């Protein structure tokens, strides 16, 4: 469950290290985002000479949460950190590599690129 002011790790090589959620997109008063939801973020920490800079406001998709995701068979997949992948305005990933596992819930038409770049799909 990601809400406003949540700090997330960035799981790609866009140059951002950490980001803060400033808005959950999709709905007028939507409070929480789960895995696969698009959020608006601001970059809090970035590496030098990266593709993104500190203070930029971008979109991102949530790929890992501590809360996890419940499958239809009753199993729950949880992670140690909250993580996101930075997107451009066309909702395509800015980075060319994804770090760490992602879940099958991202397997929609919009995020197949993230699935194909990820080292492990749970």
Curated annotation (Swiss-Prot):
Pfam families, A to Z: Ribosomal_L14 (PF00238)
InterPro entries: Ribosomal_uL14, Ribosomal_uL14_bac-type, Ribosomal_uL14_CS, Ribosomal_uL14_sf
SMART domains for this protein: Ribosomal_L14 (SM01374)
A GO biological process held by the record: translation
Gene Ontology molecular functions: large ribosomal subunit rRNA binding; structural constituent of ribosome
Coiled-coil ranges from the UniProt annotation: none
Source domain of life: Bacteria
Matching Gene3D superfamilies: Ribosomal protein L14
GO cellular component, one term: cytosolic large ribosomal subunit
Record key words, sorted: Ribonucleoprotein, Ribosomal protein, RNA-binding, rRNA-binding
CDD domains given in the database record: Ribosomal_uL14
Subunit structure: Part of the 50S ribosomal subunit. Forms a cluster with proteins L3 and L19. In the 70S ribosome, L14 and L19 interact and together make contacts with the 16S rRNA in bridges B5 and B8.
Function: Binds to 23S rRNA. Forms part of two intersubunit bridges in the 70S ribosome.
Membership in a protein family: Belongs to the universal ribosomal protein uL14 family.
Protein name: Large ribosomal subunit protein uL14
């Amino acid at each position: 469950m990601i809400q406003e002011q949540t700090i997330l790790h960035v799981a790609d090589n866009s140059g951002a290290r950490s980001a803060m959620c400033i808005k959950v997109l999709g709905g007028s008063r939507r409070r929480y985002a789960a895995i696969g939801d698009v959020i608006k973020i601001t970059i809090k920490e970035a590496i030098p000479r990266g593709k993104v800079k500190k203070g930029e406001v971008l979109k991102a998709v949530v790929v890992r949460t501590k809360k996890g995701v419940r499958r239809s068979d009753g199993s729950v997949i949880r992670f140690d950190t909250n993580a996101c992948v930075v997107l451009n305005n066309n909702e395509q990933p800015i980075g060319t590599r994804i770090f760490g596992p992602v879940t099958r819930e991202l397997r929609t038409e919009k995020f197949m690129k993230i699935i194909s770049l990820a080292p492990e799909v749970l």
